[in-house]
Amino acid sequence: MERSDLPPDVVIRRLPLYARSLRYLLEEGVHSVSSQELGERINVTAAQIRKDLSYFGEFGKQGIGYDVEKLLQHIERILGLHHHWPVALVGIGLLGQAIARYEGFRTEGIEIVALFDSDPAKIGQKIGDLTIQDFAHVRRIIAEKQIKMAIIAVPAQQAQRVADVLVEAGIRAILSYAPMILQVPEDVWVRYIDPVAVLQSMTYYLAREQEH
């Protein structure tokens, strides 16, 4: 499927927020919710929620709202969360170690199943049940474990080389913590987490406040 045939990326990015809010509602014992109530939880208008969901079908009934459990099931299916998604993590420094120990992935249908680093001092060490593997073996292990997603937590100067190897190995989706834009083929999906860039975007507003 061509990217132009898909819903807007911003819509896809909001779906996990909807799913998380719906899970919280179920935990609170709430079984029906209006688009207005759901929107208030995640700072989105009711109209935006209805428009987002309209890309995938018809959900809910006017005047009644959404069945929380059914809508959650629909969104999880749209996101592919009814599948198990194995993930490779490359770069086991302090950040990588924290990511490897994060328990939240498994509850969302995602599991880190392979750890890689190029530092001989780290190779062979264990984090939980996983042993850190030599990055030189990444192609073989990715093929064996049928991994399609990877997290990059290496310094910026190493990130492009790592991404190139991962793509060659068959990785189709990358989450990068490296502060640089990766060059990848059009059929590979990339997301970035750059805390410095996010903080700098907020300093704009703080600076404006100080000027007035």
UniProtKB/Swiss-Prot annotation:
NAD(+) binds at residues 91-96. It is found in: Cytoplasm. InterPro entries: CoA-bd, NAD(P)-bd_dom_sf, Rex_DNA-bd_C_dom, Tscrpt_rep_Rex, WH-like_DNA-bd_sf, WH_DNA-bd_sf. GO terms for biological process: negative regulation of DNA-templated transcription; response to redox state. Keywords: Cytoplasm, DNA-binding, NAD, Repressor, Transcription, Transcription regulation. Coiled coil: none annotated. Signal peptide: none annotated. Its main location: cytoplasm. GO terms for molecular function: DNA binding; DNA-binding transcription factor activity. GO terms for cellular component: cytoplasm. The keyword NAD applies. PANTHER family: REDOX-SENSING TRANSCRIPTIONAL REPRESSOR REX, REDOX-SENSING TRANSCRIPTIONAL REPRESSOR REX 1. Homodimer. Belongs to the transcriptional regulatory Rex family. This is Redox-sensing transcriptional repressor Rex. It comes from Chloroflexus aurantiacus (strain ATCC 29366 / DSM 635 / J-10-fl). The gene is rex.
